[in-house]
A protein has these predicted regions:
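Alpha-helical transmembrane segments and their helix-helix packing motifs
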Residues: 2-343
Length: 343
């Protein structure tokens, strides 16, 4: 394949992205879960800082009376939120929304099979959840940075308001907001892969992430911190059933956005020799592995969480994340054992 036939010279970048995925599915479940935990925590740190910065818009001279300056709030939120993904990429951690691109690229280049993708996606998604929950506990009951349980301060009240907005949207809207989000997140990751120096990578990441946050798109992993923080700070005025109402469709949308508009797009550009049949097969393969992942990593936990919520009410506030953390940890080890046995 001649380079002249490849638009924008994307073939070398796609190859690098695909190869970078290899350690992600060859690592042990303990390391994968820990790396996922760190990514969830990094994204949560970005969200925490964004709320602290955004609250400036609630006070004079930026606010008028009791009406806060919403455009300024969104701009400030977007301006500092990127520190989370910058830490994920530069420091090193495993973020599921980014792994949609990495593992899809590895599959397209035949470096990974279905089981490898499923293992990485499940482990990183579960680790992201655990890290996000830990940071939600950190800012409310453990440090009171966002106030007391049921008595949030200005930062906690803002988190509750954000969480309330997130769980109030309809499922189809959440799906499409998820597409837009991970389209931009993975463009940020793609751009950073095309830049060599650290400062350039930071800029390459910052602008797309600023855009997705300020626009108001939905990120499943960020929501794993934002909504549980709202659940705890509001003393269960927001419920786990509402959490899953958001996260399940957003996860689906994130997968479509990251795969179709980034991983698949650049694979298609990188290989002008592809036949229509090969293109269709790659899309079908993605849908198959994603649906399996979505059921096991998102729908089943949703069923568990909703059942506990209906049965226990407020008693499920801390029990749901505990049980789901155990589910993800055990699941990652079981899946890894199966992958290793067939490797």
């Amino acid at each position: 394949m001649s380079k002249e036939k490849v638009l924008y010279g994307v073939d070398s970048t796609f190859e690098a992205v695909a190869k970078k995925a290899t350690p992600k599915f060859k690592t042990t479940p303990g390391r994968l879960l820990f790396a996922g935990f760190m990514a969830g925590a990094f994204i949560a740190f970005g969200f925490i800082l964004a709320i602290v910065a955004g609250c400036i818009a609630k006070y004079p001279p930026f606010a008028v009376g009791d009406t806060f300056n919403k455009p300024l709030f969104k701009i400030l939120l977007g301006a500092v939120f990127p520190v989370g993904l910058i830490a994920v990429i530069l420091a090193g951690a495993d973020l599921w929304t980014g792994n949609v691109q990495f593992l899809s690229a590895a599959k397209a280049k035949r470096y990974a099979d279905f089981k490898c993708i499923f293992y990485n996606w499940f482990g990183s998604y579960g680790g992201n959840f655990i890290g996000s929950i830990f940071l939600a506990l950190l800012v409310v009951p453990l440090t009171h940075l966002f106030g007391q349980v049921g008595e949030p301060n200005v930062f906690g009240s803002t988190a509750v308001a954000i969480a309330t907005g997130k769980v109030s949207k309809d499922i189809l809207t959440l799906f499409f907001l998820g597409i837009g989000c991970n389209w931009l997140v993975n463009i940020a990751i793609w751009q950073s892969a095309r830049v060599q120096d650290g400062a350039g990578k930071i800029l390459a990441i910052w602008f797309p992430i600023f855009a997705f946050v300020a626009i108001g798109f939905e990120h499943s992993i960020a929501n794993m911190w934002a909504i549980p923080t709202g659940i705890i700070a509001s003393n269960y005025a927001i419920t786990w059933s509402q959490f899953f109402h958001n996260v399940v469709p957003v996860t689906f949308g994130n997968a479509v956005g990251g795969f179709l508009f980034v991983a698949f797009y650049y694979w298609y550009l990188s290989h002008p020799e592809l036949s229509t049949g090969e293109v269709i097969k790659e899309i079908v393969d993605f849908l198959v592995v994603f649906i399996v992942f979505w059921v096991v990593a998102s729908l089943i936990p949703a069923g568990i969480g909703i059942a506990l919520d209906k049965a226990l009410g407020k008693g499920a506030m801390y029990l749901v994340p505990l049980i789901l953390a155990i589910y993800y940890i055990i699941g990652a080890f079981v899946i890894y054992k199966n992958v290793k046995a067939t490797a």
